[in-house]
UniProtKB/Swiss-Prot annotation:
Lineage of source species: Bacteria, Pseudomonadati, Pseudomonadota, Alphaproteobacteria, Rickettsiales
GO biological process entries: tyrosyl-tRNA aminoacylation
Catalytic activity: tRNA(Tyr) + L-tyrosine + ATP = L-tyrosyl-tRNA(Tyr) + AMP + diphosphate + H(+)
Protein name: Tyrosine--tRNA ligase
Protein source organism: Ehrlichia ruminantium (strain Welgevonden)
Record localization: Cytoplasm
Subcellular location, principal: cytoplasm
Residues in S4 RNA-binding domain copies: 348-413
MF annotations from Gene Ontology: ATP binding; RNA binding; tyrosine-tRNA ligase activity
Chain residues that bind L-tyrosine: Y38, Y175, Q179
EC code: 6.1.1.1
Motif 'HIGH' region: where in chain: 43-52
Subunit (UniProt): Homodimer.
Amino acid sequence: MKLKSDFLGLLYSRGYFNQCTDLAELDQLMSKECVIAYIGFDCTARSLHIGSLMQIMILRYLQKCGHKPIVLLGNGTTKIGDPSGKDKSRTLLSSSDIQENTLGIRKVLEKFIVCGGGVSDALLVYNAEWLDKLNYIDFLRNIGRHFSVNNMLTFDSVKLRLEREQNLSFLEFNYMLLQAYDFIELNQRYNCLLQIGGSDQWGNIVNGVELGRKLKLPQLFGLTTHLLLTSTGEKMGKTADGAIWLDGEMYSPADYWQYFRNVKDEDVGRFLRLFTELPLTEIEKLENLKGYEINEAKKILATEATRICHGEKIAQDIAYDALKVFECNDHSGLPVFYVCKSEIELGLSVVKLLQVSGMEKSNSSAKRLINDKGCKINDIIILDVNYKLSLQDFCGMSYIKLSCGKKRHLKVVLESDL
């Protein structure tokens, strides 16, 4: 697709773009002038996790392309809870919890974007500023009358709950009105013309665009990104052990690096486009690496993603420590266990390896070790009890280091079949 706007062209070429309310008109506008756009985050936790990382990267690209991002922290809408993608009502948070979460999320966002008074500096705005002051009767007369309940019932966030006979509170039903109203407030206060969100927010975003039209405001635009899924179709952001937080105190930078180092081969190219700022020409070379060489691309992905989130020095230190596993460490003193190459090619489970090598007494104790994050291969934590070793884990070497806790280590040597 040929686009005039650098920003929209970037979203399209790097795989962010999903759909837009009026792409041709928005492209024309963004190619000519600085556009003010907003992305909202509700304050439901003390940090954002990597499920929000795609939106955060878009905030960065808005700035890099000369546009002005508004980050809307939903300390007002959090009091209600967004029903989108939820099977049940959210637990209502106390005012003090929302305040603490708001401060934590702000701290995370300030690592990624430049905030201030410059032309393309981000504005941090809080919707409680206007939502807390709303007069209910006036809101119903001036805003509520523009919404059709018939239409609202067709939105997935409502329809799916009702089809499953799951409770949808009147409180949550109002959420889409408040999100639409946020867009109107941001337009009138800051001349914001564009709202960006995940594809699950399409209905809410369109509501805001339509409300602006009915109120005879300048044309507003909505744009959505693809939902962040892995190659296996799983929603990204959480593992079996919990969320991958962007706050280094809640999820260590080293674990963050390892998370990206451990992604599936099929995800490497896409994640390089989404979560790094490497040129596309370089990414194309990296994603074409085959066999164990793909691990080099994974290391670059992990280091670049960690750099953006936690800073250059921390990322380089973690990458260097990982490199020392083979290139600097001497593993000659470790006990040795031999495995046949054919076993690895067939897929040797880590649980079985722990048991047959004598590192663990039984399969159940091996699984407990993995669930407790005590098992590492080449100092990378194994999180999946069903994980199977492949030749790629050997990174072109003749052995791997298998660790159980901090003190027990084994050198697993690849042996050719006779």
